Amino acid sequence: MVKRIKVVVTGANGFVAKNLRKYLSKNNINLISISRNDFKEYNDELKIISKNYDEKIIIDKIKNSDVLIHLVGIGKQSIHIDYEMINVEFTKHIVNLAKKAKIKKIIYNSGLGVSSKTSVGYFISKFKAEKIIMNSGLNYTIFRPSYIVGKDDLFTKFLKKQIKLKIIEIPGSGNYSIQPISINDVVKVFLQSLDQIKFKNKIIDLVGPDYLTFEQYVKLFSKDTKTKIKKINL
């Protein structure tokens, strides 16, 4: 009998995680999913609810799993919660949990545009998180996705809200290129990365096949809605 791969997923309630868990479950992956808040589990999925990802609650349940997929992160900060707290320090906590649980591989969802030369706070925090993972001694795969699009994705929700207001605000010129990628393609690559050797200790950009400018994407999305496009100087 072939041994089922045992995978731990953090941030189980998020857009990417929900789609990924569904896909992994259909592909006979043994799932352990963790979230701060309650969620509906799939058949044969172990659900863990822990507000602070408490080691005492989690460690025995995830011990000796094959892979941990870390999907917790924020793209917007406030006075109550910031990039350093979630994207950096929390990643450090998750890496420590993985090592204590004797998990050999970690997969991290970073972001397209992350580099050592960035001056943007969000990308800086993601770069720091990547370094924590790369220096952990664990086998790792880091994905840097472009806009991930699909049912109920955050970017689509944002644009729909703006359309209701009859105006979409574009940061800057809008002439910068994007390569949106379907969530259906993303989950397939995540599944492949669980055990294929070509993904070992790699950083991989996840982008769709089509280039278009941000302004073009917004115009296509809002076509036939009589929505005004407004550019915001940065």
Model-derived segments and their meaning:
Residues 2-27:
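N-terminal Rossmann NAD(P)H-binding glycine-rich loop of SDR-like oxidoreductase domains
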Residues 29-36:
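Conserved glycine-rich Rossmann-like NAD(P)H-binding loop of the short-chain dehydrogenase/reductase
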Residues 40, 49-101, 112-117:
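NAD(P)H-binding glycine-rich loop region in Rossmannoid oxidoreductase-like domains
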Residues 86-136, 140-146:
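Conserved Rossmann-fold NAD(P)-dependent oxidoreductase catalytic core, especially the SDR/UDP-sugar
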Residues 120, 141-160, 176, 212:
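Flexible, glycine-rich beta-alpha linker
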Residues 154-155, 172-194, 202:
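Substrate-positioning beta->alpha
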Residues 159-172, 232:
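A short C-terminal helix-loop "cap" of Rossmann-like NAD(P)-dependent dehydrogenase/epimerase domains
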Residues 193-234:
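Mid/C-terminal beta-alpha module of Rossmann-like enzyme folds, strongest
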